[in-house]
Amino acid sequence: IQELFASRGFTTGVRNGRRVGFFHGTGHGLGLEIHEHPRLQKVVLKDRQVLTVEPGLYYPGVGGTRLEDVVVVTKTGYRILSRFPKQLEI
């Protein structure tokens, strides 16, 4: 994800001693608790697991954003359960 963001001009690194850009996890499992395993890293996902996909960008002095989708893993891929429109408003 860092490479994708960097290719579009949103770099990750340290500025003035603070982390900037995309520096946290991509998402996690959902269940009885809000934050459950698996953490979205290099893991094998299983059919019917429910996960969040929530990349975010943060730049001190500018602001930050995080878009979150809830998805369910299927035998053939995934299905997005979130139905919130994604529209940029400044």
Report residues per predicted region:
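Active-site cores enriched in adjacent His and Asp/Glu residues with nearby glycine-rich loops
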Residues: I1-G27, G31, Q49
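Charged, cofactor-coupling segments
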Residues: G27-I90
